[in-house]
Amino acid sequence: MSTTFETTPAQITALMSRPTDAPVVMVNLLKFKQDGGWERYLQYGEEVAPHLERVGATIRYGGTAPANIIGDGERPWWDAILIVEYPTPAAFIDMVTSESYAAVHKHRAAALDRGDLIATSTWSIGD
């Protein structure tokens, strides 16, 4: 289980090795801090919106995770899922490495007990 909220150089290198002309869809699994985590994350959401817009990212889904239907346990470890599509891996990296984003990122880090970020690729059933 990772509790860090920073990417490593190896993770950035792996992301940059993906196709440069294909979107990357980031799946965020979010566990909020008990005391004010949800509120801090909403603040992050408001402040990150212009950064997402600047790089052409689109929020595809956001919602809570109240129960498992298939899987271990009655409830997943995360409280919410957020799915954001970036036009390219470079767009994501451009956003998260900008100085202006660093001021916003502090709210995300303060809001979460855990926040896994999984880089995925899209595919169709016929692929």
List each language-model region with its residue ranges.
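Short amphipathic alpha-helices in soluble, non-transmembrane regions
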Residues: 94-100
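A common structural junction motif
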Residues: 100-106, 112
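Core nucleotidyl-transferase/polymerase catalytic module
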Residues: 113-117
